[in-house]
């Protein structure tokens, strides 16, 4: 076989090797359409460590955010096992999530589950509150056996604004589900005094933004809202 006849097969083999090399075109994740990939930062690529090709993609809602990437209420969801956390020590964590300034970090267990065992075990040499009250009852029969505890929760409830109380109840019910974005959620948007900000929005679902509406500082909807797509501005007379 002459060298001229060998040239076309060699060129074809070279082209196949270049296409399969790491420097070639990025492989697309199954389930991410071409239109969806255009909105995914960095493209939709397969993992190099042999993981599931679809790990970085949602079925029909665009690419999932990887660990360390920015996230928020209006961004695609974090990958499984990750949660969108606001910046540490941020004074307005929910506002940071609304602005997309969170980070996808490993999911953490609720802190309450870790604190309860420590609180239930008194240190050696210390008397439990019920034992102290029992001794006081024996010395002073006219006193009450109910432990006297400061009503810190009640004081906080009276000092909190209506939006902050609403927010606390939502967080208690949803706990970590608030940041996962598995479904459309409503998390109250409060100002630093605990009242409602003028613009309230539901969370996004995939790359589709949730609806927004306008309220006064007590959370009452104002005329002309919601608009259904979150594009209108709210009047300046309400809290925000």
Curated annotation (Swiss-Prot):
Its main location: secreted. It comes from the Eukaryota. O-linked glycans consist of hexose (probably Gal), N-acetylhexosamine (probably GalNAc) and sialic acid residues. O-glycosylated with core 1 or possibly core 8 glycans. O-glycosylated on one site only in the region AA 143-168 in cerebrospinal fluid. InterPro entries: Growth_fac_rcpt_cys_sf, IGFBP-6, IGFBP-like, IGFBP_1-6_chordata, Thyroglobulin_1, Thyroglobulin_1_sf. Keywords: Disulfide bond, Glycoprotein, Growth factor binding, Secreted, Signal. PROSITE patterns: IGFBP_N_2, THYROGLOBULIN_1_1, THYROGLOBULIN_1_2. One of its GO terms (biological process) is cell migration. It is found in: Secreted. GO terms for molecular function: fibronectin binding; identical protein binding; insulin-like growth factor I binding; insulin-like growth factor II binding; signaling receptor binding. Residues 139-155, 228-240 have a biased composition (Polar residues). Residues 109-160, 217-240 are annotated as: Disordered. The keyword DNA repair does not apply. Disulfide bonds join 29-32, 40-44, 57-63, 71-84, 78-104, 163-190, 201-212, 214-234. The keyword Glycoprotein applies. GO terms for cellular component: extracellular region; extracellular space; insulin-like growth factor binary complex. PANTHER family: INSULIN-LIKE GROWTH FACTOR BINDING PROTEIN, INSULIN-LIKE GROWTH FACTOR-BINDING PROTEIN 6. IGF-binding proteins prolong the half-life of the IGFs and have been shown to either inhibit or stimulate the growth promoting effects of the IGFs on cell culture. They alter the interaction of IGFs with their cell surface receptors. Activates the MAPK signaling pathway and induces cell migration. Interacts (via C-terminal domain) with PHB2. This is Insulin-like growth factor-binding protein 6. It comes from Homo sapiens. The gene is IGFBP6.
């Amino acid at each position: 076989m002459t060298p001229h006849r060998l040239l076309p097969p060699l060129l074809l083999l070279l082209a196949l090797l270049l296409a399969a090399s790491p420097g070639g075109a990025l492989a697309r994740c199954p389930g991410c359409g071409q239109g969806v990939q255009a909105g995914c930062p960095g493209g939709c690529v397969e993992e190099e460590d042999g993981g599931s090709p679809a790990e970085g993609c949602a079925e029909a809602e665009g690419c999932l955010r990887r660990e360390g990437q920015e996230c928020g209420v209006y961004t695609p969801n974090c990958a499984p096992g990750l949660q969108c956390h606001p910046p540490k020590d941020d004074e307005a964590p929910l506002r940071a999530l609304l602005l997309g300034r969170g980070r996808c970090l490993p999911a953490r267990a609720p802190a309450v589950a870790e604190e309860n065992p420590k609180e239930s075990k008194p240190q050696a040499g210390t008397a439990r509150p019920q034992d102290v009250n029992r001794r006081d009852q024996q010395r002073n029969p006219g006193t009450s056996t109910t432990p006297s505890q400061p009503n810190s929760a009640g004081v906080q409830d009276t000092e909190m604004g209506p939006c902050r109380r609403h927010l606390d109840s939502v967080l208690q019910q949803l706990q970590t589900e608030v940041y996962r974005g598995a479904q459309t959620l409503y998390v109250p948007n409060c100002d630093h005094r605990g009242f409602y900000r003028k613009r309230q929005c539901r969370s996004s679902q995939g790359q589709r933004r949730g609806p927004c509406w306008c309220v006064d500082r007590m959370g009452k909807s104002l005329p002309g809202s919601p608009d259904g797509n979150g594009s209108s501005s709210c009047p300046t007379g309400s809290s925000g």
